[in-house]
Amino acid sequence: MFDCSGCPKLQNLEGAPEEVGFFDCNSCPGLRNLEGAPEKVINFDCNNCYNLKSLKGAPKEVRDGFFCYSCKKLTSLEGAPRKIGDWVECWGCDNLIITDKDRRKYKIHDRD
């Protein structure tokens, strides 16, 4: 378990296991809160800007991002789907979105 939430300036995980590797959020100076990261490195949350535009060296599913077709923004990857059908909350529009089989497109669920 990697949890760098106690260090707001940590920008990478050099020396971490191969599947974690090197991560760098280019849109802000700090990438934090990698709770639950070691297995296949899915949960990422940049607490400074809430926008993961570029994660150099991140796994493909992270680099692709999670795009909300409702507000046209990339959603936070905190609580990102671990399997098809898991719900995610888009911080851009507060809608709930759900992955389809390619893990990059979503069905929109307006909570109102």
Task: Name what the model sees in each region.
Residues M1-K9, P17-G30, P38-N51, G57-K73, ...:
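Concave beta-strand-loop units of leucine-rich repeat
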